[in-house]
């Protein structure tokens, strides 16, 4: 079975679509939207409940797209933690497109965030508008924007701390 899944080329994003369905065209968070996007933010370390714009206005931004069930996403958070302190003028935001509800609560998400050392804005985007706007086709996925919100780099899979630094040095 595992070989069959690997052979089918399923990525984190396609698994999400299989679990949650394709966003409907009428959904305001549907894939047709561009950037910036507004996401709900959660009360968790480094994050407060409310909303945030992705990318952040007037600041270079590292956008991490993840899922709690994605083991490689844990590794991505470690890379981000390793570089965050070196870039105080850069906004960091992690966004999941998982649907918060019966099987995953806000508390579950905050607990996962705490266990994985997240210390910056944590957002949810159940309509996958952010994922679509960045053209993400796998998780984890990292995008870096400049202060004008223009995408300057993207990376599918785990971006190492060295890769993040190299890309961030172009916008700071």
Regions found by a protein language model. Give the residues of each.
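Thiol-/selenol-based redox modules, centered on thioredoxin-like
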Residues: 146-172
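Short pre-active-site segment immediately N-terminal to redox-active cysteine/selenocysteine motifs
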Residues: 59, 66-69, 138
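Structural recognition of the beta-strand scaffold that forms the well-ordered cores
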Residues: 64, 91-94, 121-123
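N-terminal targeting signals for export/organelle localization
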Residues: 1-42
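Structural microenvironment flanking redox-active thiols in thiol-disulfide oxidoreductases
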Residues: 74-116, 128-132
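Short, internal strand/loop/helix patches
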Residues: 110-148
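Aromatic-flanked redox-active Cys/Sec active sites in thiol-based oxidoreductases
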Residues: 64-70, 97-98
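A short beta-strand-turn-helix
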Residues: 35-60
């Amino acid at each position: 079975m595992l070989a069959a899944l690997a052979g089918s080329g399923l990525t984190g994003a396609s698994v999400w679509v299989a679990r949650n369905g394709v966003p409907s065209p009428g959904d305001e968070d549907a894939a047709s939207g561009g950037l910036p996007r507004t996401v709900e933010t959660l009360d968790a370390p480094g994050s407060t409940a409310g909303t945030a714009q992705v990318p952040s206005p007037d600041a270079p931004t590292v956008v991490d797209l993840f899922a709690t069930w994605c083991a490689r996403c844990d590794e991505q958070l470690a890379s981000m933690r390793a570089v965050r302190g070196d870039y105080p003028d850069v906004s960091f935001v992690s966004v999941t497109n998982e649907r918060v509800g019966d099987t995953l609560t806000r508390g579950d998400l905050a607990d996962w965030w705490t266990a994985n050392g997240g210390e910056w804005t944590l957002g949810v985007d159940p309509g996958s508008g952010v994922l679509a706007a960045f053209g993400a086709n796998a998780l984890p996925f990292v995008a870096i924007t400049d202060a004008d919100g223009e995408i300057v780099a993207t990376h599918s899979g785990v971006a190492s701390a060295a890769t993040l630094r190299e890309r961030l040095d172009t916008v700071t």
